[in-house]
Design a protein with these regions (language model features):
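Patatin-like phospholipase
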Residues: 12-57, 67-264
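Cleavable N-terminal signal peptides of Sec/SRP-targeted secreted and luminal proteins
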Residues: 1-15
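Catalytic nucleophile loop
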Residues: 63
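Catalytic nucleophile serine of serine hydrolases
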Residues: 60
Length: 264
């Protein structure tokens, strides 16, 4: 897999101050540190105003990166990227999960997830507690009860950002559902591995025309599905190929829907 920095420009040539700029972090999971490297490249190589994003979006573990960007004000890109780089350079010091007392088998049978993710909750409280978002955000998660995809940003206060990120990063199967805001949550990657349409709607609510919205997407899957000869595949390679195809289309689906839905 390679890191793709895919920029969708829903604009003609207008004054820069008239743009609503969106930064969307894909789900990523263990590859989210690469998103930070790509963001650093954007910051170092683009006009400073072009990376002063108005709306920040994140799905699954991309929601953590989104939250860390959002707690820094526009214009503080240097401090923001330094903090993010520092976090992921020391990722070996981060404990995101631990085994249940009787291991993954206990998780599968009685805990709702293979691993216990309470260490991740503790890390989020340490890193984000008391730090509020300074920009408009979207953080996607799925309500376990009804299956709705919900933007947790609507529920966030300064004291609740870490809880929202914890809910948005409750990776289905691996971790149990997270109970926050009176509901149970899974991460949103099963529906939108990359969230684009929601942030565009945020810009629209802020009074921007579609032609004045710019979306930068950081995703950790390829934008090209590799071909392979499957003539002699047995069951396991066929299943792996199916999963590869499924992940590819789910990853680019949100972007394609945005492009087709907002041709301006």
């Amino acid at each position: 897999w390679i890191l793709i920095v895919f920029t969708v420009i829903l604009a003609c040539v207008f004054a820069k101050s008239d743009k609503c700029r969106i930064l969307s972090f894909g789900s990523g999971v263990e590859k989210v540190p690469y998103q930070v490297g790509a963001l650093k490249a954007l910051i170092e190589n683009m006009d400073p105003e072009d990376v002063q994003y108005d709306v920040i979006s994140g799905v699954s573990f991309g929601a953590f990166n989104a939250a860390m960007v959002s707690v820094h004000k526009k214009g503080d890109e240097k401090a923001m990227i330094e903090e993010l780089e520092g976090i992921w350079k020391k990722s070996d010091k981060i404990t995101a999960y631990q085994n249940w007392w009787f291991g993954p088998a206990q998780g599968a049978i009685s805990k709702g997830g293979l691993y216990d993710n309470t260490p991740w909750e503790a890390y989020l409280k340490k890193t984000l507690k008391g730090r509020g978002a300074t920009r408009v955000m979207t953080l996607g998660a799925v309500d376990v009860a009804n299956g709705d995809y919900v933007d947790l940003a609507d529920l966030i206060t300064t004291e609740k950002l870490e809880q929202a990120v914890y809910a948005a990063t409750a990776l289905n199967v691996f971790f149990p559902p997270v109970t926050e805001f009176g509901r149970d949550w899974f991460d949103g990657s099963g529906i939108w591995p990359v969230e684009v349409i929601g942030p565009i709607a945020r810009c629209e609510k802020m009074g921007y025309n579609y032609t004045d919205i710019v979306v930068d997407v950081l995703m950790t899957t390829s934008d090209v599905l590799p071909e392979r000869n499957s003539t002699n595949d047995s069951t396991i390679p066929s299943v792996l190929r199916y999963l590869e195809i499924s992940e590819f289309y789910s990853g680019v689906n949100g972007i394609k829907r945005a492009v087709y839905g907002f041709p301006e």
